[in-house]
A protein has these predicted regions:
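Peripheral interaction segments used for macromolecular assembly
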Residues: 1-198
Length: 198
C-alpha cells in the first residue's frame, strides 16, 4: 500500500461536503455525518442533509459503493438515483453505532498506557476508504510541538469495541503532529508490526 499525503483526510473535513452528480453537475445534498464501520475500520458512507444553512436531515443515505470520487471539496456520484432510503446495511450501521462513537474514546496501549482521547479519524482515500489513524488530544505522555493534538497510526486490522481503543505499545515511535507526513508514519508502523524491524 502506498499512502500519498494528499489522499489523507480527517473525517470531520468531509462534513458539509456537497454531494454532486456527474449526470448534471448538480449539488443535491450535503454530508451530515461520516459513517465509520468500527469492525471493518473503514468508511461505509454518509448520512445526508439538505443543502443550505438551515438544511435538515434527509431520509436518504449514501453508501460508499455509490461514490464515484471523493476529494477535498466534494463527493461525486453518478446520479441522484444513487442515494438510498434508510433501509439498507448503511442505515443499520448508523443505528447500531449510536452510543459507540469513536470520537472522545480513550486510546490505550496494550501495555496499559493512556495516550489521550480521539478527536478525529484519519481516512486514506485510495482504492477504497480505509481508516489509518486517529487524531488524539489530551495526552499526558505524548507532547506535540504545536496545536495540542497528535496523529496515531493504526495497525492494518483493529477491532473497536467497548469504551477504550487499544493500540500496540510500539505506536509511540510513529506518532506525529504533522498530517502531511502521517502517511509515511503509517507505512513504517505497519512494516514494523509485520517484520519487527525498527
Amino acid at each position: 500500500m502506498s499512502v500519498h499525503p494528499s489522499l489523507l483526510l480527517r473525517a470531520t473535513e468531509l462534513i458539509g461536503h456537497p454531494v454532486v452528480t456527474l449526470e448534471g453537475g448538480e449539488a443535491i445534498a450535503e454530508v451530515k455525518d461520516v459513517v465509520y464501520g468500527s469492525a471493518e475500520a473503514s468508511l461505509l458512507g454518509f448520512t445526508l442533509r439538505h443543502r443550505g444553512f438551515l438544511g435538515g436531515p434527509m431520509k436518504q443515505v449514501l453508501a460508499w459503493a455509490q461514490v464515484v470520487a471523493l476529494g477535498r471539496h466534494a463527493v461525486m456520484i453518478a446520479s441522484a438515483g444513487d442515494l438510498a432510503e434508510r433501509d439498507d446495511v448503511l442505515a443499520q450501521e448508523v443505528k447500531e453505532s449510536r452510543g459507540r462513537n469513536v470520537i472522545d474514546s480513550e486510546v490505550l496501549t496494550d501495555a496499559g498506557e493512556r495516550l489521550g482521547e480521539v478527536t478525529d479519524v484519519v481516512i486514506l482515500i485510495d482504492d477504497g476508504p480505509e481508516v489509518v489513524g486517529y487524531e488524539i488530544g489530551g495526552s499526558e505522555v505524548l507532547t506535540p510541538r504545536s496545536g495540542g493534538h497528535v496523529f496515531v497510526p493504526l495497525p492494518e486490522t483493529l477491532a473497536v469495541s467497548g469504551e477504550a481503543l487499544i493500540v500496540p505499545a510500539a505506536v509511540h515511535d510513529f506518532v506525529t503532529d504533522d498530517l502531511a507526513g502521517f502517511g509515511a508514519a503509517v507505512e513504517r508502523f505497519r512494516d514494523h508490526l509485520r517484520t519487527g524491524s525498527p
